[in-house]
Amino acid sequence: MEKGFSVGWRIRTTAEFRRIYAARQRIIGRYYLLYYRENEIKHSRLGVVASKRNVRKAVWRNRVRRVVKETFRIRKKDLPAFDIVVVAKASSVEADNKELYECINKLFTQLERQSKRSSSV
């Protein structure tokens, strides 16, 4: 299993983020919003947004990002070929790591279900 979060797995440019937001497909969780869009490559890619406006302190922003990246790293082989942007809500500050992991896992599971549903139609 890969340990890092290399460039090939990341969404990097503003244009890519805008394209995903424009697709208007999202799943809402308690601590995160997950935006997604099918991509042309064979694997999923991730972008994480934890803005100063929602998550004030850098320590909190880094923790929120770290939880998302780690969960993605573990589950990326099971995820469908989507570009995924995870946006941290202000409520994520009050959650402990266990709650954050549970929330992001639930969102990734819902994404897998939706992709299976849309591919069978």
From Swiss-Prot:
Which reaction(s) does its UniProt entry say it catalyses?
Endonucleolytic cleavage of RNA, removing 5'-extranucleotides from tRNA precursor
Top EC category = hydrolase
Q: Which GO terms describe its molecular function?
A: 3'-tRNA processing endoribonuclease activity; ribonuclease P activity; tRNA binding
Q: Where in the sequence is the signal peptide annotated?
A: none
Sorted UniProt keywords: Endonuclease, Hydrolase, Nuclease, RNA-binding, tRNA processing
Query: GO BP, one example?
Result: tRNA 5'-leader removal
Query: What EC identifiers does the entry list?
Result: 3.1.26.5
Q: Which cellular components does GO assign to this protein?
A: ribonuclease P complex
Which domain of life does the UniProt lineage start with?
Bacteria
| Pfam families, A to Z | Ribonuclease_P
- According to its UniProt entry, what is the function of this protein? RNaseP catalyzes the removal of the 5'-leader sequence from pre-tRNA to produce the mature 5'-terminus. It can also cleave other RNA substrates such as 4.5S RNA. The protein component plays an auxiliary but essential role in vivo by binding to the 5'-leader sequence and broadening the substrate specificity of the ribozyme.
Family the UniProt entry places it in? Belongs to the RnpA family.
Listed under subunit, the entry gives: Consists of a catalytic RNA component (M1 or rnpB) and a protein subunit.
The protein's matches in HAMAP family, at most eight in alphabetical order, are given as: RNase_P
Designated name of the protein: Ribonuclease P protein component
